[in-house]
C-alpha cells in the first residue's frame, strides 16, 4: 500500500483535508459521516478542521480508549456526532447503518480495503436513500465504482488485475458538482 508517512506529509495534504470539509458542507451537510485518514495524527487534524467549521467531529484510532471508541459509535448512531475520523480502525467489523457519507482521505492500492471502507456506508437504514462518497484521494479512479461488477475467483490460473492498475471501468468527475460516474 502507499506509505502513510509520505501521504500524511504531502505538501497538498492541508488543502485535501480542507476541501473535504467544504465538500462535506456542500454535498453532505450534517449527514452521519465516517472519514478514513492515513494516520492517527491525520485523523486528529481532520477532526479539528471539521470542528473549526462548526461540525461535531472526533478522531479515533486503535490507541483510543475503548470508551471513546464506543462513544464515537454511539454519537453517529444517535446523531450527537456529525463526523468520525479514523485511521484503519473502522475499515471492517463496524456496523453503523445510519452512516450516509464516507470521506476517503487515505489512498489505498487495496481493492478490499477500499470496498470495505465504502461498505461502512452501504447498510440500509430507515430514511436513508443513498450514500455519498467524497473521494479526495483517487480511490474510485484507481479501483472503479464500489457497485461495479467484479469477477471473484479462487482459481490460481486466473490473472488478477494488479493492485496498481487503473480501473477497467473508466470514471469521470463533474467539475461543478464533483459527482463521479462510470464513463
Regions found by a protein language model. Give the residues of each.
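Residues at the C-termini of beta-strands that transition into short coil/loop
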Residues: 61-63, 106, 137
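A short beta-strand element within the Helicase C-terminal
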Residues: 82-109, 113-120, 130-135
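Conserved interdomain linker/interface between the two RecA-like ATPase lobes of SF2 helicase motors
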Residues: 1-38, 157, 165-166
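C-terminal helicase lobe
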Residues: 78, 111-116, 120-183
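Short, surface-exposed connector motifs at secondary-structure boundaries
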Residues: 25-32, 53-56, 97-100
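A generic secondary-structure signal
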Residues: 22-26, 49, 75, 120, ...
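Conserved helicase ATPase core of P-loop NTP-dependent helicases/translocases
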Residues: 34, 42-92
